[in-house]
């Protein structure tokens, strides 16, 4: 049927744009990449981009959705099913810091995702229901609005820590330790309860996991 053919071509065009966009974002960052470059990388005319996505931010939103699913899924697979939700939160967010540290284009991509309206809204609204599952023990009276407001705070902390590169003084260990301390305090978790999980995260080889997630995401986008 003609309608199915058009739909299939639209999906194929979109997938090509996603792969081309991800490739260019990883090479040169979000800010330096244009929609025309993405379209040419996909083997299409510059105008073809807008048949697939409204703008570059819409493409980044799709990539943000893909990356977040990948990192959360990987963190869950690293831990036993009955593991503490605090450790899962620490592992997920620590992994995210490692992904942003893999390269400067990735840092730019993640910081931008936490900054633009549609992508940051997706992140905040996706995280809010997870917060109830993770922190309900310490925030029993918090309703959804309060959790959303606190997610805005922890997302701001996340963006700030991702935006600053590690160096010989501000090591990855110091970054993760301070970052997780800030986030757990936002959700009223006592230090004696979260401290052991911070140490577990620091002992994990999250940098290798982060590189694998990026490689697998690119590979899946090409499929």
For each predicted feature, which ranges?
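Generic hydrophobic, amphipathic alpha-helix propensity
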Residues: 10-22, 38, 63-67, 71
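Hydrophobic alpha-helical connector segments
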Residues: 62, 73-106, 124-128
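Short, hydrophobic secondary-structure boundary micro-motifs
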Residues: 107-112, 192-196
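Secondary-structure edge/capping motif, primarily at the C-terminal ends of alpha-helices
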Residues: 75-79, 107-110, 161-168
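Amphipathic alpha-helical packing segments from all-alpha helical-bundle domains
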Residues: 114-163, 174, 178-181
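Extended, charge- and Ser/Thr-rich helical segments
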Residues: 1-12, 22, 31, 45-47
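Helix-turn-helix
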Residues: 16, 24-58, 62
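C-terminal peripheral helix-coil segments that are non-catalytic and often amphipathic
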Residues: 132-137, 163, 167-223
